[in-house]
């Protein structure tokens, strides 16, 4: 069956590939035929005519800034130990930011702010406005201060004496670029003293798969000094002052910070859904209300760097929350990550160089902390095993009378001092731990690019085999070995637990422990290898603990003797037990009455 399953997807994939190639060949042939019908001189003439019309329109729009309407793109670079910032004279804005300490999957330097445009509207003449991003500024020479920071100014001046000055300053060991905007003649350049700022952004793939990175991308912002975010195709209108807006990818972010707040604005964000390397596009419109004065200044800052919790914490209030340690329905795991997982992880990373071993130590720490509950669970399981013969006798006695069996079973548990739900506590505890680690491993940049054993990157899935087709239900076109080890150890735990518990008569319950590990195969195959490695180690520890505790620590004869002793001691029923038994007795009476009532023919 498995061979047929894989063969089907391989054959389907081959057919689709052939069909795409055939369609492309047809399109190429049509394009070549159409190109032959167009004369070269007609193409040149059309281009010249289009350029002339475009230039005339730009000059007209620029009005008093007509000299800045046309120009040639030139760039200037500011650098420190962490980043290299390329500035362009067109718009006097940032063209790109290269992060020196981070690389992409193909070993190229990580670049941010590549498909960005930042600018604002200025009055250029009567009833005419232009975007600053369309005007050509004149750059000054670079200046270097005693503290090691470098600065440059971009200036444009109008025929009426107004001017715009952009000053950029890059400080040592910083991912933040200071951007000061000075408007000379602001009362003429702005309408009603409002600076309407526009930021157009488009993010591209930096991690292994664009699809997964899209899921991890979002827009974060601080409105009214409170953190919030949007992660679906959405539009957000700001009703309170905004401190910063951030375009976030899985491990990096580009954040625009207003040192004196944006007064209002809106952001529109949407993910791409095609097969390209593009992730999302954003249009952010922000307003800054300036005093009605001849000259005005706006202090901004552009952060382009890693989503590192400690770095962002020092950057601006609430910016560290860009790192997703748990949000929405998983917000309850954020304190676990912030106050337990992250400090312990960083502590181990302080003296262990390989992050795979750090994950192992973190796993052992978690299992050590939860060990009292684990022991309690195994003890409860041992008590249930000791009571199995008596439970079988009760079950045989009551037969199909489920109500009677349940009442007698509860009585037996109470007399023996057994909590039937005692074994569930560690399993329930694993739920918040799993979701906490899922958020942590997907957002902790220290894991990015870190190799361990056969995994090349602990922040992404490991690959031991690439398939010629893609398996649905989230499995993908690869096989992760850490996923296989996690699933196999989960199967072993299920087999061991089934051998220690009474046999289930219900076929669905009987096979349920085996179904869950199989489901993990599809859930885990695309998750970070750090998470599947954690799960593997945790399962191995579980198997070891079960074997040692059940065979060398827990004495079943002693447990039976203790339970027999407890039965001799009269126990007062709790209010909950009394109510529960009354409810069961009422249900039994109703069932007996229903069974005695003759059915109508």
Predicted segment positions?
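Short, Gly/Pro- and small/polar-rich lid/capping loops
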Residues: 39-73
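Soluble non-transmembrane domains of integral membrane proteins
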Residues: 68-323
